[in-house]
């Protein structure tokens, strides 16, 4: 039996709150159940040196966890003096996922950085980050259009991500921490709206998984991500504004 008696193909309750903080061009609090991530998108009128003169922009991301985002305090990476390998892997994944839905030429010579800060972690922090960051990026780009800095929308659609896995021999969608820590197979899937895949990260933690199980997990991921796309669309169509 899953936590909260969830069906195997159902995501946790998903909540996306736009305009969560005051200063960022795009700001979203995304919640996958008890996992909560703040995603802030910042626009800078410059590009990395390797793109100077290339007539295109850049989208990148940074990721971090607050010290008490987990059950016990974790030292800030700034205090350690360097980022961990997991952090660098996740922020690169977020950035690649966002670039998959942006026409960098149409963005112009500017950079959008999305900072994803995990407030509370209960599994799926990277997938929640991607899903929330997409909405924050959308809002930042819309501000550029509203301010007359862009003539056309460089965003080609939505991107979202979800975790799937095999727990106690059962394929399940959107794993909570207690499931993730006991999964025989753990997989993260990133997808755009037309069903094409951006990235698949899958690992057998114990028993290897079969080709048939891989296809089953991908089908389960697609069904879960469709639920996330719907949550994104609802948030973007709403007049949600957390700032008063």
UniProtKB/Swiss-Prot annotation:
| Catalysed transformations (reactions) | tRNA(n+1) + phosphate = tRNA(n) + a ribonucleoside 5'-diphosphate
Q: Where does phosphate bind?
A: 86, 124-126
Which gene holds the coding sequence for this protein?
rph
Q: What protein does this entry describe?
A: Ribonuclease PH
Q: Which UniProt keywords apply?
A: Nucleotidyltransferase, RNA-binding, rRNA processing, Transferase, tRNA processing, tRNA-binding
InterPro entries xref list: ExoRNase_PH_dom1, ExoRNase_PH_dom2, ExoRNase_PH_dom2_sf, PNPase/RNase_PH_dom_sf, Ribosomal_Su5_D2-typ_SF, RNase_PH, RNase_PH_bac-type, RNase_PH_CS
Query: What is the protein's known function?
Result: Phosphorolytic 3'-5' exoribonuclease that plays an important role in tRNA 3'-end maturation. Removes nucleotide residues following the 3'-CCA terminus of tRNAs; can also add nucleotides to the ends of RNA molecules by using nucleoside diphosphates as substrates, but this may not be physiologically important. Probably plays a role in initiation of 16S rRNA degradation (leading to ribosome degradation) during starvation.
Q: What is its EC number?
A: 2.7.7.56
Origin organism is Glaesserella parasuis serovar 5 (strain SH0165) (Haemophilus parasuis)
